[in-house]
UniProtKB/Swiss-Prot annotation:
PROSITE patterns: DEHYDROQUINASE_I. It comes from Salmonella agona (strain SL483). Keywords: Amino-acid biosynthesis, Aromatic amino acid biosynthesis, Lyase, Schiff base. Gene3D superfamilies: Aldolase class I. Pfam families: DHquinase_I. Involved in the third step of the chorismate pathway, which leads to the biosynthesis of aromatic amino acids. Catalyzes the cis-dehydration of 3-dehydroquinate (DHQ) and introduces the first double bond of the aromatic ring to yield 3-dehydroshikimate. Homodimer. InterPro entries: 3-dehydroquinate_DH_AS (IPR018508), Aldolase_TIM (IPR013785), DHquinase_I (IPR001381), Type-I_3-dehydroquinase (IPR050146). This is 3-dehydroquinate dehydratase. Pathway: Metabolic intermediate biosynthesis; chorismate biosynthesis; chorismate from D-erythrose 4-phosphate and phosphoenolpyruvate: step 3/7.
Length: 252
């Protein structure tokens, strides 16, 4: 299986990489959060642009991206607008969403973008190609905050992301039962062992699913999300605790 290298970080080998999310509403918030994150132990900084109030003004978005880049100089920057329908803070039209991601790619300030699988195949494929032309990696994602689909459906979605050119397919689902967590882990193993030719990221959310955030190296998930301050999704644990557990499992 091939790995994905972003800056000096190799995703898909060794312990799962830790991603943290920055969620400031204004440029001032974004700067202060980035400064607070500077000393934290993580691997990838995700900027959750859907939390940013001025998201429809390209100049403001790029100014904020530049501010983050000036403060966090050494870590890969992942640009993510999470749509309202997949748990995000705001809604954009498909045209606005694609234009925003293309502007991020054009800026040269971001290393990765997050594209939601269900944006539309043609739009997704074209935007993946555009990102790759500019040496920007693509995490393709799907989120279900209500349930855990069947393992076959989870695998099918991850395979579809791979077919559409994602560098890293990602899925996050909500467990209603403990068995749902096993469903997600089973799907992860099946995808990783039978179909994946690149790293994948999977997680079962909430307190019930927290084991999935810790045991990625065992089951086949190449990265996990931790919290520096406020969690960006239910079930996230602090980056310090996360690193400790990931290291223990890696060295076992």
């Amino acid at each position: 299986m091939k790995t994905v290298t972003v800056r000096d970080l190799v995703v898909g080998e060794g312990a799962p990489k830790i991603i943290v999310s920055l969620m400031g509403k204004t440029i001032t918030d974004v700067k202060s959060e980035a400064l607070a994150y500077r000393e934290a132990d993580f691997d990838i900084l995700e900027w959750r642009v859907d939390h940013f109030a001025n998201v429809t003004t390209a100049e403001s978005v790029l100014e904020a991206a530049g501010a983050i880049r000036e403060i966090i100089t050494d870590k890969p920057l992942l640009f993510t607008f999470r749509s309202a329908k997949e748990g995000g803070e705001q809604a954009l039209t498909t045209e606005q969403y694609i234009a925003l991601n293309r502007a991020a790619v054009d800026s040269g300030l971001v290393d990765m973008i997050d594209l939601e699988l269900f944006t539309g195949d043609d739009e997704v494929k074209a935007t993946v190609g555009y990102a790759h032309q500019h040496n920007v990696a693509v995490i393709m994602s799907n989120h279900d905050f209500h349930k855990t689909p069947a393992a076959e459906e989870i695998v099918q979605r991850l395979r579809k992301m791979q077919e559409l050119g994602a560098d890293i397919p990602k899925i996050a689902v909500m467990p209603q039962t403990k068995a749902d967590v096993l469903t997600l882990l089973t799907a992860t193993v099946e995808m990783q062992e039978r179909y994946a030719d690149r790293p994948i990221i999977t997680m079962s959310m909430s307190k019930t699913g927290v084991i999935s955030r810790l045991a990625g190296e065992v089951f086949g998930s190449a990265a996990t999300f931790g919290a520096v301050k406020k969690a960006s999704a239910p079930g996230q644990i602090s980056v310090a605790d996360l690193r400790t557990v990931l290291t223990i499992l890696h060295q076992a």
